[in-house]
Curated annotation (Swiss-Prot):
GO terms for cellular component: plasma membrane. GO terms for molecular function: phosphatidylglycerol-prolipoprotein diacylglyceryl transferase activity. The gene is lgt. This is Phosphatidylglycerol--prolipoprotein diacylglyceryl transferase. A 1,2-diacyl-sn-glycero-3-phospho-(1'-sn-glycerol) binds at residue 138. Belongs to the Lgt family. It holds the Pfam family LGT. The keyword Acyltransferase does not apply. The keyword Repeat does not apply. It comes from Geobacter sulfurreducens (strain ATCC 51573 / DSM 12127 / PCA). PANTHER family: PHOSPHATIDYLGLYCEROL--PROLIPOPROTEIN DIACYLGLYCERYL TRANSFERASE, PROLIPOPROTEIN DIACYLGLYCERYL TRANSFERASE. Its EC number is 2.5.1.145. It comes from the Bacteria. Pathway: Protein modification; lipoprotein biosynthesis (diacylglyceryl transfer). The chain crosses the membrane at residues 16-36, 55-75, 87-107, 198-218, 232-252.
Amino acid sequence: MQFPHIDPVFFRLGHLEFRWYGLMYILGFIAAYFIVRRAAGRRGLALTQDDVADVIFSLAIGVILGGRLGYILFYNLSYYLSHPLKLFAVWEGGMSFHGGLLGVILAGVYVARQKKIGFPVLADICAPAAPVGLGLGRLGNFINGELYGRVTDVPWGIIFPGGGGVPRHPSQLYEAVLEGPVLFLILMAVGRRERPAGVVFWTFIAFYGLFRFLVEFFREPDAQLGLLAGPFSMGQLLSFPMFLLGLTMAVLVSRRKVGP
């Protein structure tokens, strides 16, 4: 199956180009605002619309800075040490979920203190917004024809531009489904009942780690790294500890009494 030609630029205004991938980020942050606002209301938190906007803005900064720094440190440090000016060339790509997660956690701790909310409570109301952004982001990867999967002979294999002219797993779509609607529904199911603060967040950590670990078996490893430990990629080495930590913490936190 040939990759459908989709122009990565959806709108041009003179020399300005607006790309689908950037649009996915914007839509993800907009959706996050409404999801967090609704979740805060259900929790009875005294957060105004401006407070929620402050939270989303802080987390967005954490995602962007952490995601960029994480990619540099985890995936391509030697290149950026040799080309330091490329550190700021974010339009060329290069973002890491795991770095973005660390950035979000740090930003979340900061904004939780500013708004006088317990971090576990804030993490719980924000966690369901993450799958929306993740799912949209993976669709952006697919539109760009990047982060494609390994060579395959399955009927739905796609020949991506730059993919060697052979069918590959559309692993971006696998991730879009698992990290998007599937993970969102899991978090919504967990959050339906009143639970100790932090359970929803740690459930997100566990299932993201699990889904990412599994999909990495179908995803082409980063060219500059390859497989690092037997059949495992960098993404798997970062994701499996997430799964173990998230699962352990979700079980431990769920045993506490309900409350902030």
